[in-house]
Amino acid sequence: MDHNFSCKCIRLRKASNNLTKIYDSALIKVDLKITQFSTLKNIQKLGKTNFKDLSYLLELDRTTVLRNIEKLIKMNLISYKNEQNSKNKIIQLTTVGKSKLREAIIIWEETQHKYIKALGIKNYKEIDTLITKISKINI
């Protein structure tokens, strides 16, 4: 095996998985995963939204978003109902969801601060810039 071989895709996935574990471990205190937190935060950002707009904002395929929101509906954190006089379904936070999100934001901010401190602000900013660039590569 070539010991000099270093697939950046796999290395980025490993780093992403590690970071996901860090945030999931912190958010377990409020019975959420980072993906659920992100979905709730984006629903909060949009206010009342629809499935198409939420999928676009999250940059996820519709199947993944549907699977994620079904879990959040079962947890009574969001509602997904037909808009009056329309076939369009509206997604919004429930009262329970708003409360859970307030708790989760505090934990997320603490975790984010620890992550930045461990990495160093210069590295954090560089990684943020690189993530943006990597996300836009189209070859």
Regions found by a protein language model. Give the residues of each.
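Alpha-helical linker/hinge and terminal dimerization helices associated
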Residues: 15, 19-22, 58, 100, ...
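Residues at secondary-structure transition points
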Residues: 3-10, 14, 34, 49, ...
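Exposed, interaction-prone assembly regions rather than primary DNA-binding/catalytic cores
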Residues: 125-139
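N-terminal helix-turn-helix DNA-binding core of bacterial DNA-binding proteins
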Residues: 17, 21-64
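N-terminal leader segment of winged-helix/HTH proteins
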Residues: 1-30, 77, 93, 134
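Residues in the recognition helix of alpha-helical DNA-binding motifs
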Residues: 68
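Charged, amphipathic alpha-helical coiled-coil/dimerization segments
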Residues: 71-129
